[in-house]
């Protein structure tokens, strides 16, 4: 897996997953850890998507944390990707290409997590995430732009972050 093809935020999400595994005394990086990483580093992206889908982000984080706490603890050894986590990353690469992106974004990772069967997918689906609506929210978030740089996520919704819409005010 070439992480140079991931955006900086996606790389940070994977790094957060690794740190979470280590801090919890676990060894296997599961899709749940990847989802936790995406939620932690991609707040702007996930908050926008969750709001559009009518999801409670805090509830998702709570259920996810309980699920991660229930995973087996192992002392010693380096963290490694489970088959499910590896499948998530492979699918994220595929989804990125399908979206016309040059880099794997947090949105592609979220799409992949949703579509790889397992606990992380179930958590998202139980909270109300549906692929068609997720894709629609991603399109709205991106406003027709593709991920063409490693820092593309920082440009999403930049106008709404720093300006006031006088029509809405």
Where are these regions (language model features)?
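Histone-fold recognition with a strong bias for associated Lys/Arg-rich disordered tails
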Residues: 1-169
